């Protein structure tokens, strides 16, 4: 029983080590948040144009 447990434990450690070694770093692409305004006639939301947004932020 102890030998079987030892074998399973070693196999688990080897599999865990293989997962860690072969893991690729996750390169998360951070999306720029967009600000929205009410569309023409209230038909939903549309993104604020960047030039208008920059002008408002720099005022």
Swiss-Prot record:
Residues 1-23 form the signal peptide. The keyword Translocase does not apply. It comes from the Eukaryota. The keyword Repressor does not apply. It is found in: Secreted. One of its GO terms (cellular component) is extracellular region. Keywords: Hemostasis impairing toxin, Platelet aggregation inhibiting toxin, Secreted, Signal, Toxin. Salivary gland (at protein level). Interacts with human F2 (thrombin). Anticoagulant protein that acts as a competitive inhibitor of host thrombin. Inhibits thrombin-mediated host platelet aggregation. This is Salivary thrombin inhibitor XC-43.
